[in-house]
């Protein structure tokens, strides 16, 4: 008689051997939660069968609502209805007010300048609001899986910086979730498509969601997902389509008052509905604030064309970073609800010369990929051979003498990664070293972004260059950076975990990369000049000390020649001619060679003083 394996509907046939894990797509406009059941990834629906959860929270003095119930309150109570909070994550209040001047809810500044949202439930930061959304998703998963989650994978835009990633982890912690890891959204999509289709080669992941745009160029080979390059815009998405269309409707309807939050919410709702209708129809009817009219797809396309073009410029930069052409890309994966817009699909297809892939629901594909990864990380697939390699978007390094940046980890290096370099002291008797962590592609500190500063103290007093300090940069799988500095002879060390107080401004990453290309030649010249000035300062300081201690070894004429050479070097170092400084250094070296030899002879003579030849 055959034996049958019996399991509860929707549950594993070996429930006691499996751990419960979920993938969460914490989106700007909508969020989802997914899991793997019976070997198949699936998104989880609410009691009404709805898979998407609006990323909206409505606060009252007695409590709060999340999702559809909260969104329903937006028109009547916009001040206390928080949406698109993902855009506020990791940003300063000043940055938010400059970027989003028409937010309906009230913002206040905390003591450290970070934003707090004024609600009937009190002053809440974006981390707390995100935590409330995560709680709703976690509860949906617990009900569907009939148990508590052992771990989750949460997706974030590839361009989220350290502060934004840390804020996401903090929100999960507030929600009572154990984060197995953060996963870049495009990489999650690659996991979903890679496992389903088993393709190998170069793939572009075009992710246009509600509030962010990411483009990633990946190489898929034998289960290995390697991100060759990333790009995008952390403040561009379907919400911007809605705002442009809402402003257009406002003009057509002749609504001049911009202070009425209720009217603004009605306009946005009407714009969103029209955008959805125009994905399938050529004309959408609009009825808002007593005005009736129509919007054509052609009019909508004209409004959003500049934004779509911006995404394609990011695609071009990412391909260049990856060292591939558009013709090398085998498939283009479309992710995010905004990729349903016909103009987006059309322009992306034209750019890459192929029809984009949309076989997996673009709203669900990221959550599905996260669920697959969570299932592996929680230990349900110990035999999995899939390897995931993310990259850092901008180079990481240190400030060195002369205002130069020494890159320790170049951009597009796969993570997790650890790199170390050794540095020495610049001055005699130096007992401390300031460590200035930098991010960017340029050669000079003034052109890069400061991430953090700390000081290594307790360095033994030695001559310049005598102490050796090993600085280690470590980026974990979530993209968070730890920097440790250690003096090798004593083992004394200091470290810092980089958690910037707020994120990069709009387009800053893209402009930093572009500037490094545009100013490459000038940067090389500037670095050469700075290096020569640092070397000149080192030579002059060393000679000043030598002359003070051993100047008696020189005749008056020899001293005058050295003084003259040093004066010429000082004059050259004050200028901006690297070649002139280099020549002056060589001249000074030539004039001091005999002096150096005499100092060496004198040192040997003093060392042998009082000893016989036999003792030597």
Swiss-Prot record:
Belongs to the heat shock protein 70 family. GO terms for molecular function: ATP binding; ATP hydrolysis activity; ATP-dependent protein folding chaperone; unfolded protein binding. The keyword Cell membrane does not apply. PANTHER family: HEAT SHOCK PROTEIN 70KDA. The gene is hscA. Pfam families: HSP70. Keywords: ATP-binding, Chaperone, Nucleotide-binding. The keyword Lipoprotein does not apply. Chaperone involved in the maturation of iron-sulfur cluster-containing proteins. Has a low intrinsic ATPase activity which is markedly stimulated by HscB. Involved in the maturation of IscU. InterPro entries: ATPase_NBD, Heat_shock_70_CS, HscA_NBD, HSP70_C_sf, HSP70_peptide-bd_sf, Hsp_70_fam, ISC_FeS_clus_asmbl_HscA. NCBIfam families: HscA (TIGR01991), PRK05183.1 (NF003520). Gene3D superfamilies: 1.20.1270.10, 3.30.420.40, Actin, Chain A, domain 4 (3.90.640.10), Substrate Binding Domain Of DNAk, Chain A, domain 1 (2.60.34.10). This is Chaperone protein HscA. GO terms for biological process: iron-sulfur cluster assembly. SUPFAM superfamilies: Actin-like ATPase domain (SSF53067), Heat shock protein 70kD (HSP70), C-terminal subdomain (SSF100934), Heat shock protein 70kD (HSP70), peptide-binding domain (SSF100920). It comes from the Bacteria.
């Amino acid at each position: 008689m055959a034996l049958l394996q019996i399991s509860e509907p929707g549950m594993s046939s070996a429930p006691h051997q499996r751990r419960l894990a979920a993938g969460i797509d914490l989106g700007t406009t909508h969020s989802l939660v997914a899991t793997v059941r019976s070997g198949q990834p699936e998104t989880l629906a609410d009691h009404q069968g709805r898979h998407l959860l609006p990323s909206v929270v409505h606060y009252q003095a007695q409590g709060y609502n999340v999702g559809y119930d909260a969104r329903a309150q937006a028109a009547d109570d916009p001040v206390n209805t928080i949406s698109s909070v993902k855009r506020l994550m990791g940003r300063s209040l000043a940055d938010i007010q400059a970027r989003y001047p028409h937010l309906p809810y009230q913002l206040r500044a905390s003591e450290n300048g970070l934003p707090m949202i004024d609600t009937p439930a009190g002053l809440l930061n974006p981390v707390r609001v995100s935590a409330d959304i995560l709680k709703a998703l976690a509860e949906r998963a617990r009900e569907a899986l009939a148990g508590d989650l052992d771990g989750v994978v949460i997706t974030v835009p590839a361009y989220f910086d350290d502060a934004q990633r840390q804020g996401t982890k903090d929100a999960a912690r507030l929600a009572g979730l154990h984060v197995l890891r953060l996963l870049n959204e495009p990489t999650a999509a690659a996991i979903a498509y890679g496992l389903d289709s088993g393709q190998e080669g170069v793939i572009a992941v075009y992710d246009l969601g509600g509030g962010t745009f990411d483009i990633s160029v990946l190489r898929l080979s034998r289960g290995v997902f390697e991100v060759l390059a990333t790009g995008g815009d952390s403040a561009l998405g379907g919400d911007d389509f809605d705002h442009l269309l809402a402003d257009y409707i406002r003009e057509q309807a002749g609504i001049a008052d911009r202070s009425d939050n209720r009217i603004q919410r009605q306009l946005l709702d009407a714009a969103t509905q029209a955008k959805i209708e125009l994905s399938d129809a050529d004309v959408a009817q609009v009825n808002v604030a007593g005005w009736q009219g129509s919007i054509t797809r052609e009019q909508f396309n004209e409004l959003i064309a500049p934004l779509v073009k911006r995404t394609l410029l990011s695609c071009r930069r990412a391909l260049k970073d990856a060292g591939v052409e558009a013709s090398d890309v085998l498939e283009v994966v479309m992710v995010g609800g905004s990729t349903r817009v016909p103009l987006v699909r059309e322009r992306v297809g034209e750019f890459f010369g192929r029809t984009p892939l949309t076989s997996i629901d673009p709203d669900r594909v990221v959550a599905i990929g996260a669920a697959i990864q969570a299932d592996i990380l929680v230990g349900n697939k110990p035999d999995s051979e899939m390897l995931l390699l993310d990259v850092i978007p901008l180079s990481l390094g240190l400030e060195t003498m002369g205002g130069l940046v020494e890159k320790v980890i170049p951009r597009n290096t796969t993570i997790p990664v650890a790199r170390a370099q050794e540095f020495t002291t610049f001055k005699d008797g130096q007992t401390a070293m300031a460590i200035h962590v930098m991010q960017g592609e340029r050669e000079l500190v003034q052109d890069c972004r400061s991430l953090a500063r700390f000081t290594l103290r307790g360095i033994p007093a030695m001559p310049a260059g005598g102490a050796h300090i090993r600085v280690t940069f470590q980026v974990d799988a979530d993209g968070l950076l730890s920097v440790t500095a250690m003096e090798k002879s004593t083992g004394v060390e200091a470290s810092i975990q980089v958690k910037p107080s707020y994120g990069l401004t709009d387009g800053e990453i893209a402009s930093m990369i572009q500037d490094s290309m545009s100013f490459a030649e000038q940067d090389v010249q500037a670095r050469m000049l700075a290096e020569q000035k640092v070397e000149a300062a080192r030579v002059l300081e060393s000679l000043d000390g030598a002359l003070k201690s051993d100047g008696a070894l020189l005749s008056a004429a020899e001293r005058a020649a050295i003084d003259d050479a040093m004066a010429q070097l000082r004059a050259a170092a004050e200028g901006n001619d690297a070649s002139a400084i280099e020549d002056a250094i060589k001249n000074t070296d030539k004039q001091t060679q005999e002096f150096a030899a005499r100092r060496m002879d004198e040192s040997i003579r003093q060392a042998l003083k009082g000893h016989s030849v036999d003792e030597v």
